[in-house]
């Protein structure tokens, strides 16, 4: 992979981190825990929560475990992102999104000992999440699309 493409994928990761941290800072500055504000009626609200667990608050309070998993996941994603054997735009974009999401939540865990969540979908019963979580989810979907439908053709 050329250095320009490597830089592009790192920029994608960086944009995820910046957007995630800026929205989290906005929420912390303007909301109290539990406060809710409708953004798009019937679609999206901001609800400020502090999550000291993982998805659905599993493993609540297990910070050492989250640190180790985050560091290992970052290492694995970087390995695949920069390994010339695994090169595909969809795959690499997915990995860049996952990397940005992992780092975005890792920053919270290191600094605050919890993750700030705020995005609530009002049209479906779903947990409150953040931009980093969204990037990880979309990134994993892109990686799976590549692995299931494209990788055999490469």
From Swiss-Prot:
InterPro entries: Peptidase_A8. GO terms for molecular function: aspartic-type endopeptidase activity. Its main location: membrane. It is found in: Cell membrane. One of its GO terms (cellular component) is plasma membrane. It is a multi-pass membrane protein. The chain crosses the membrane at residues 8-28, 58-78, 88-108, 131-151. The keyword Zinc does not apply. Pathway: Protein modification; lipoprotein biosynthesis (signal peptide cleavage). It comes from the Bacteria. The keyword Protease applies. It holds the Pfam family Peptidase_A8. One of its GO terms (biological process) is proteolysis. The active site is at 117, 133. It catalyses: Release of signal peptides from bacterial membrane prolipoproteins. Hydrolyzes -Xaa-Yaa-Zaa-|-(S,diacylglyceryl)Cys-, in which Xaa is hydrophobic (preferably Leu), and Yaa (Ala or Ser) and Zaa (Gly or Ala) have small, neutral side chains. Its EC number is 3.4.23.36. This protein specifically catalyzes the removal of signal peptides from prolipoproteins. Belongs to the peptidase A8 family. This is Lipoprotein signal peptidase. It comes from Lactobacillus johnsonii (strain CNCM I-12250 / La1 / NCC 533).
């Amino acid at each position: 992979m050329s250095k320009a493409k490597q830089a592009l994928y790192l920029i994608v990761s960086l944009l995820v981190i910046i957007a995630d941290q800026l929205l989290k800072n906005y929420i912390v500055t303007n909301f109290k825990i539990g406060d809710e504000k409708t953004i798009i009626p019937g679609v999206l609200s901001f609800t400020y929560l502090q999550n000291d667990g993982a998805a659905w608050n599993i493993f609540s309070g297990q910070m050492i475990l989250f640190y180790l998993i985050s560091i290992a996941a970052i290492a694995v994603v970087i390995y695949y992102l920069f390994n010339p054997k695994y090169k595909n735009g969809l795959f690499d974009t997915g990995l860049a999104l996952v990397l940005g999401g992992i780092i975005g939540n890792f920053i919270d865990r290191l600094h605050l000992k919890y993750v700030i969540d705020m995005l609530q979908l009002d049209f479906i019963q779903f947990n409150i999440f953040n931009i980093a979580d969204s990037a990880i989810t979309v990134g994993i979907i892109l990686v799976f699309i590549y692995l299931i439908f494209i990788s055999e053709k490469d």
